[in-house]
Amino acid sequence: MLESYFPIFVVISIAIILAVVLLSIGKIIGPKRNNPEKLTPYESGMDPVGSTRTRVTVRFYLVAMIFIVFDIEVIFMYPWAVSFRELSGFYGLIPMVTFVLILLAGYYYILKKKALDWDEE
């Protein structure tokens, strides 16, 4: 029974060995000297202005999580839209309508809780 897992073991072993070898080569061959110019933060080719250690408000993370949820929605809707003709008519529409209604309920909840309001309280 374990013989059937041997190819998987070989592939994982090769991947680990290759990763270690490539990281080691990069460490050996790569540049080792740091200077102040290399240690400055990069801001799109501009000279850094102000401190780079400022705090980011939680609202940015909330917007990022909402974006991920709706991005995943699009990922699920694309295969459904491509194969819609092969689905059995109305019965192919019901699961997607249910899925979209659940997501719209979540979006309504977000708006109701005023999670996207950026006004100071």
Curated annotation (Swiss-Prot):
Reactions that this protein is recorded to catalyse: a quinone + NADH + 5 H(+)(in) = a quinol + NAD(+) + 4 H(+)(out)
| Residues that span the membrane, as ranges | 6-26, 62-82, 90-110
The UniProt entry lists membrane topology as: Multi-pass membrane protein
Task: Tell me which UniProt keywords the record has, alphabetically.
Answer: Cell inner membrane, Cell membrane, Membrane, NAD, Quinone, Translocase, Transmembrane, Transmembrane helix, Transport
Q: What is its main location?
A: membrane
Q: What is its EC number?
A: 7.1.1.-
Q: How does it assemble?
A: NDH-1 is composed of 14 different subunits. Subunits NuoA, H, J, K, L, M, N constitute the membrane sector of the complex.
Q: Which family does it belong to?
A: Belongs to the complex I subunit 3 family.
**Described purpose of this protein according to its UniProt entry:** NDH-1 shuttles electrons from NADH, via FMN and iron-sulfur (Fe-S) centers, to quinones in the respiratory chain. The immediate electron acceptor for the enzyme in this species is believed to be a menaquinone. Couples the redox reaction to proton translocation (for every two electrons transferred, four hydrogen ions are translocated across the cytoplasmic membrane), and thus conserves the redox energy in a proton gradient.
Q: What HAMAP family does the annotation carry?
A: NDH1_NuoA (MF_01394)
Q: This chain belongs to which protein, by name? A: NADH-quinone oxidoreductase subunit A 1
* Biological source species: Chloroherpeton thalassium (strain ATCC 35110 / GB-78)
Recorded name of the encoding gene: nuoA1
